[in-house]
Amino acid sequence: MAKMIFVNLPVGDLVRSTAFYQAVGGEKNPQFSDDTASCMVFSDTIHVMLMTHDKYRQFTSKKIADAKNTSQVLLSLSVDSRGAVDETVDKAQAAGGAPDPSPVDEYDFMYGRSFEDPDGHLWGVMWLDMAAAQSATAQAS
């Protein structure tokens, strides 16, 4: 069985956040969603659990960070093409996110942009041509 990742994010408005993550490609799994959490599926191995602050507090005694003012993690998803990078960031902006809070990464073998969700969580979207990346690495050494 492939290893899976479940990213748990506290959100201020579950309905708004669920709609946002659906707009950028997540599919809500009703089996693991209720009025306190939405399980957003991005692939067989990548899930984002959106939780109300009350629900999130059940898992930690630590204070919930204000992601609009504090950054602890930058999450990144890979996509299949350069165009899909731009498309995903455009969808994030149309759904209420902020495009490109981080500099755009552009190389012959890689292209990456970022967005901030309505709660301030930072996401990177990247495309990588693995063969070209390996070639560039080999030439550099």
Describe the function of each predicted region.
Residues 1-19, 30, 72-77, 126-141:
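N-terminal beta-strand motif that seeds the catalytic metal site of vicinal oxygen chelate
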Residues 8-57:
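Core segments of cupin and vicinal oxygen chelate
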Residues 43-45, 53-55, 79-82, 118, ...:
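Short loop segments at secondary-structure junctions
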Residues 56-63, 133-135:
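A short, acidic/glycine-rich surface segment
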